């Protein structure tokens, strides 16, 4: 069977082989036999890019001809994953290139491994943005991703003595073949200084002029976003920072070395890392700089692009939407106002009318800590004119609140954009945009009824839900080619662009042969992951064991701690009852903790310490293994999703906005073990409660405890010997070589209220026994191999709702109102 139809005559095999050889010669002055694997990767990528650029040009020409409305998707993160394999799949040329490289003596899988994961994001926020760009291109909509070209990303995670160590992720060290530098579109971005007000007699208005500022040049680098089998190539534009003035040789010659490179360092600092530690003033200032830097450059570019083809900026909302991915880009509201007022000479009312019909905001969190607030002192000093504009937005917004709720001072306190010395960015986005969306039905309900209740009461028409989705082209076709081929053999390939077609697989739920094939594919993927674990961790795991997986950003609300405490409980059970019939389990973790997040980093140490004890205990005969996968990222995630039996989605109910890992596991036939939180609720609706393992407090119960009190974790400690035993092991040296203090902070966080932090903030002890019971149900279900296979197949068959294609179409229909574009032959 030919896995992919042939799209492009450029991929005639002989021509492609010739292009690779020529590229090796041109780039490295070598023959193909002398080239390293990295050099072959660069040469192959350039040959592929050559085809992409033809389509990229054709796409731009079509957009110029059709003049469609554009969505600018503004995000601090784009977690793209490797581009080579994904581009080949979307060009429908994977098979041909694989064969061509085979004939040249190279393995495409090995060549793909030479590509670094672009370090442009960290967690679900950035991966969602990447999936959305894939879907926008595949569906044929004109879109630009806008972000920052971080030189070192968040960090590369090393595990040393069980602890996370952060090292720079130098992903650009060999050059990145899938980017184009575009200095002709550079934009100046200004920081600091002061605002001079000058009366303009001609217009009878004040002019506001920023002076005494420092500035940097924002230089765009463009990455192609290839649509599936449609010749459309959209653009991810990431901004690098360069100094306005070059290296000062005169200062250097005087020995003033620091001053000679001052401008260069100012620029470099902005783009070095994603999410610099903001536990101090300098870190906060740098984060704010980063946000304004990419927002200002992106909005300037969007306005310039609009003015090339249109005379009247009042038509901007008909042709442009700025989608703000979380609170980081919400300064867009004020920056757009600045440009319209100061550079385009508009009156406030007309500028506000344009802005509030152009900006739309996606809320990604219920966690108050992530709804960004900036100290006035910092904000007004770094961005004096933008701050003035926000002050005026706030003044007018408060008047609007007073008109609607006369005499209600409490409303003003809760809703003001500037209050108590802070600028509240989510409030700015809601006041200054026309749409506010949550990312799963439960999440949106909680926003409307609880977190953003006052705003919902004032602007109910702005609020809507868009449940997240994932691209099946990366997370099934590329991540799990064996399963992708099997599905296509059974139901055709329509699912590649219409995921609900997976429902056709339901007819195989009682077909023993089909179930056997399905589980054999799962086994082969487990063998593949076991090999990766052996190579990277030096741990031998049994592919016949249950692969129980939790991979996601490390945060207390995601409750990796509950997972590892349960592993400790299981280990205690096996040690106490060595004769018990226990089905072998492999618990797999992968997570990065923010560099300044002490408790999260200590949880990683605990996981690795427990792993050291359990994996080296010969007396349990390998019944239990614990693996922490270092430097979790998109490329190893693809191996993990394909191999998982159990998908751990165990956040405290009401805390996870949506989650998308849950969807990737489901698509690949893993069963969800989780709380009724985020998109888990909708997953259970699709697959049926009988095909998932649900436990724990509900969102309403959690919110009730938080609002009214009454939760005492000490009750569980005092009344449940299993829980008490596990928690005592945190402080009796069991997993710390006799060091009683190593994990004391974790113990304290669960049992001792500390200042504003309530003991067991995320209800781990309340849910522990319910979780353990659900785990017992998992084991019982897995022992029934045919029943388990049916559940696995149905999870894949019911995943159709969770494509980002569906999500994007909903954004288009209900928020953006874009027109499809087709490339004319």
Question: Which ranges hold each PLM region?
Answer:
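A conserved ligand/cofactor-binding region detector
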Residues: 2-825
